[in-house]
Amino acid sequence: MRRLGISIYPEHSTVEKDKEYLTLASKYGFNRVFTCLLSVDGEKEKIIEEFKETISHANALGFQVLVDISPAVFEQLGISYNDLSFFHELGAYGIRLDVGFSGLEESIMTYNPYGLKIEINMSNGTKYVDNIMSHRPNRENLIGCHNFYPHRYSGLSYDHFITCSKQFKDYGMRTAAFISSFDATYGPWPVTEGLCTLEQHRELPMTTQAKHLFATELIDDVIIANAYASEEELQALGALNKEKQTFDIGLYDTTTELERIIVLDEPHFYRGDVSEYMIRSTQSRVKYKKEEFKPHNTREIKRGDLLIDNEQYGQYKGELQIALKDMVNTGKTNVVGRIVEEEIFLLDYLQAWDKFGFTLKK
């Protein structure tokens, strides 16, 4: 099951604000938390107690909290890979190792008596995960997560992201990646030019970022990296169908009520005899074969257009299609709507027999 997550940074906020954010995110179905203990400089006991209080609140709401720990903090706290009791006492679900060990240590850590998950960095493109696997870890407790990148243009290229993600998915591991909120104002560091894993996501709406990660079929958990996302963003992301590809669309004023019903309410799947020009969803032409589909808005067809054949197309009338290429319109096809420009690229991820749907963009 795919999941949604948020991030909190207790060293840059307050316990009260973090708890409010957790409660709000829980309302919209989020159940994973990324947080990091960057340092224990200053009042060590106070920092740890505040972490415990925040994590306890998260746990009560059903969140799974993974704590990113820097090597420096490992040393400051005297933590050994042989003894992870500190994180168990914090109430953490697991720990994230941004910088790893030799492979043997990670393997040993997966056998910790508390069942803590050991999350390793997916973004480096080395044989790191292969090395850990050669040391026979407890695979149930080993998961992966990409980095996020605050510096503009420093995020992962798509090809590198796919290569790295496949390394982990080939082992059947649970995976995660980060998306960025437009409304959030901070992360763990002073630079705040967005906190995404993929560079191409930096200027995209948050829901589109999430749809893309899920569409790759290589990412299980999508986490908002910066804090705090707005309630509107959380609500929109929480409403997302995580298992089925959906597209934000606009409909034209000329579109009839029946055509709106076909687009928005009927179930759709990508017919198996694939065309390079269109994605066909044919059940509506069967269900509504006795209805009238008068010609209207029969302009030339562009990639990303939503189409319904009119009565001039005989037995095809009522069939819904998505244009994959620009096409000549002979007057037999009504152009009823269009996928929003920033999501047209997601068409490349639909495969034969995939189920899909549409959401009317307000």
Predicted regions and their residues:
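Catalytic beta/alpha-barrel core
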Residues: 36-38, 44, 68-71, 92-103, ...
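Short, acidic/polar
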Residues: 13-26, 76-86, 129-130, 205-212
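Catalytic domains of carbohydrate-active enzymes, especially glycoside hydrolases
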Residues: 17-39, 88-94
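Glycine-rich, proline-tolerant flexible connector loops at the mouths of alpha/beta enzymes
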Residues: 31-54
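Active-site mouth loops of central-metabolism enzymes
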Residues: 1-19, 67-79, 192-204
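C-terminal functional modules
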Residues: 252-362
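Catalytic alpha/beta core domains of metabolic enzymes, predominantly
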Residues: 121-253
